[in-house]
């Protein structure tokens, strides 16, 4: 039996099933008068595009849809040649579902000059891939995306990396953070898998090895994973859709790296909020104001000062690790952080 076949097994009398269905809640969309504040992601306003709608489009319609996204600001039917930059109503070239430049005579498509230039998959597969990636709650693994779209795992993995790189480039190119800015850091990939505990001679050898490694206080030195790095998050506070993020990776929390990142990401007029880690001490003389929260005593001061927006990113990253990725690499740690920041920034925007 297939996995889908289990859903189609008869479970009882149809009349009983209809009565059970009538007793069920019909969801939040049928209660518009409810005074309880609803998550924007649950409202019809969020669902501007659906996967079923995308799958119903032809390749030509999808090309026109992407053309509007890329060149819509230039005018109706106007394209910009990726080769020479000529902006015109170029000759239509049906053989490649694209255009031929009036200036340099080069052929190009809507994906030419982008990160997916020369992509072999169809636009329908590409749009479905993008829709699944965007609609995932925390994230979606490359293996799952490869299975849904009949792609080689490496193809799906590389495409997700290209998407994350585009997110980092787009969000990171904005101006410096201003106003009320929260900053925090958290360590990832710090787990060290314990070795197998043997018996007899193997256990005795392990005890000798442990005793030989005791420090001055007779304690075992802490095991540290060589891959462990700190992810630093700067968040410009504000309403949903108006928060801005900056993500960076450092080996450890230290004054030199954190001050450099603060100067790089934040305007001097910003008001910084951090915890009481000594690495943030130099922020006081660099920015207009610097508030600190003593996390040993409280998560938020009586004045409402906290770093919850920055810490929320770390919570979502850990949720994505457990629920989707299962592992991360140092090479792509920053991209994973940018993806989560992008998902958080898009809360309050439509889905496509």
Name each model-derived stretch.
Residues 2-352:
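Residue-level recognition of single "structural anchor" positions
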């Amino acid at each position: 039996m297939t996995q889908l076949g289990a859903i189609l097994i008869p479970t009882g009398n149809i009349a009983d099933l209809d009565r059970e269905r009538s007793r069920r809640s019909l969801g939040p969309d049928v209660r518009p008068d409810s005074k309880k504040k609803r998550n924007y992601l649950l409202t019809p306003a969020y669902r501007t595009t659906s996967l079923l709608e995308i799958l119903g489009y032809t390749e030509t319609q999808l090309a026109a849809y992407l053309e509007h996204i890329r060149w819509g600001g230039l005018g109706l039917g106007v394209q910009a040649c990726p080769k020479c930059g000529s902006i015109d109503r170029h000759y239509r070239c049906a053989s490649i579902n694209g255009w031929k430049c009036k200036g340099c005579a080069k052929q190009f498509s809507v994906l030419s000059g982008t990160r997916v230039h020369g992509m072999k998959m169809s636009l329908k597969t590409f749009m479905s891939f993008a829709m699944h990636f965007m609609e995932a709650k925390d994230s979606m693994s490359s293996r799952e995306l490869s299975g849904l779209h009949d792609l080689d795992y490496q193809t799906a993995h590389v495409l997700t990396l290209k998407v994350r790189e585009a997110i980092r480039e787009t969000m990171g190119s904005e101006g410096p953070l201003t106003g009320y800015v929260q900053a925090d850091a958290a360590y990832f990939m710090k787990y060290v898998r314990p070795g197998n505990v043997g018996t007899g001679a193997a256990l005795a050898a392990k005890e000798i090895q442990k005793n030989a490694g005791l420090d001055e206080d007779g304690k075992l030195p802490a095991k540290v994973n060589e891959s462990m790095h700190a992810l630093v998050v700067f968040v410009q506070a504000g309403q949903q859709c108006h928060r801005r993020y900056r993500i960076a990776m450092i080996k450890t929390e230290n004054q030199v790296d954190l001050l450099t990142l603060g100067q790089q990401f934040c305007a001097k007029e910003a008001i910084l909020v951090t915890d009481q880690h000594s690495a943030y001490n130099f922020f006081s003389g660099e920015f207009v104001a610097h508030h600190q929260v003593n996390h040993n005593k409280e998560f938020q001061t009586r004045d409402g000062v906290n770093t919850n927006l920055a810490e929320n990113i770390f919570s979502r990253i850990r949720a994505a690790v457990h629920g989707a990725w299962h592992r991360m690499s140092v090479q792509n740690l920053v991209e994973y952080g940018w993806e989560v920041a992008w998902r958080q920034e898009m809360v309050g925007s439509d889905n496509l």
